[in-house]
Regions:
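Short, well-ordered coil/turn segments that N-cap beta-strands
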Residues: 23, 50-51, 80, 164-166
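NAD(P)-dinucleotide binding in Rossmann-like oxidoreductases
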Residues: 146-153, 163-173
Length: 173
């Protein structure tokens, strides 16, 4: 097993090479920066008999698994709305622009089309999907950046309609 925890734009090439070599891959999110690359990794894993997984650690927590079981049993009724927030002060300072460990996260060529949502907000959306047993069907998003020089968002508000009818309202910053 190899873990890929590098800038997002490198995930596809690195993961593909290991899968082709018959080695299972645990990839940091996002799996890739394009849908076509992600689909290719799925097909490569199937063809080579390997596993290509994305690291969403929160769904391993006992409390999250307990919530999922409660929802599946109907203990709390139909889930109509999930409100999730994933807030932190990480990268809140404009001085972070000089930090090479931070800089790539706001560079579309390395991070892809999203920064904050792809890095943190996706955890909340994944938990909502995991707990509700529903998948995202459609979404609308408002991405802004408090630090104007950034090319990608450091604040995101996302509304998601799940395939079972649940609405997810998510904020991350």
């Amino acid at each position: 097993l190899v873990t890929v925890a590098t800038p997002n734009s490198t995930h596809y090439e690195i993961s593909k090479a290991f899968l082709e070599a018959g080695i299972n891959v645990l990839c940091e999110k996002p799996m890739t920066v394009t849908e076509a690359e992600a689909e290719d990794l799925v097909l490569t894993a199937r063809r080579t008999g390997t596993i290509c997984a994305v690291n969403y650690g929160y769904t391993g927590y006992a409390l999250v698994r307990h919530m999922r079981a409660m929802v599946a049993r109907g203990d709390i009724g139909k889930v109509r709305l999930v409100v999730a927030e994933f807030a932190h002060g990480h990268h809140a300072n404009a001085a972070d622009a000089d930090n090479p460990r931070v800089r790539w996260r706001y560079d579309p060529a390395q991070a892809g089309v999203s920064a904050q949502f792809a890095d943190c907000g996706i955890h909340a959306l994944h938990m909502a999907s995991f707990v509700s047993g529903q998948n995202a069907r459609e979404l609308s998003a408002d991405f802004i950046s408090a630090i104007e020089s950034r090319k990608l968002e450091d604040d995101a508000m996302v509304n998601v309609r799940m395939d079972g009818g649940t609405t997810v309202r998510l904020w991350t910053s």
